[in-house]
Amino acid sequence: MKFLLTRLIFVIVLTSTSKIGLSHEYWIDPVNYYLKNDEKLVAGIFIGDNFEGSQIAFSKKYFKNSNLFSNNKKIKIRGRLGDFPALNIKETFEGINIIQIESEVNYIHYKNLSKFEVFSSNKGYKNLADKHREKNYPENFVESYKRYAKSLISVENIDGNDVDTNMELELIFLDNPLKNSKKRKR
């Protein structure tokens, strides 16, 4: 988390859309984690690997379910197709604000095992394609997946805690990471 809090600028790597589809990391990169009451919450959304990737514009494909949580309030995050950076939120609340984003279901069509073999090997599963063949699974198959992302931002103060936003897959901070961060920017 410290890495995410202190790294405010990511290099945008131009990649093809097929590369974005094969990338499995999805993250929110706020311009500032510490806002004043009158500041707009601006954040880029990235897809890539090892925190290097492409910044994407607002699209319903990537924002099927997106909300801002704070002080027992939940507000639907709205955007316009093509907004870049993707998040430009005017309405925030004093204390901890939690951005939660869930994509729609996406699909990767594997026509043969070569791309799957490269991907699974890069993720540390060198024998997975061989096991796939041994089990006589089809070489032409479809993978379905959703992407989930969450970020905490403070407005005016760092009071508050992370909450369960009811995503299918979610990490919840037991301690407030913004209180524990040694470097705060305003």
PLM regions and their residue ranges:
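N-terminal soluble domains immediately following signal/targeting peptides that reside
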Residues: 22-186
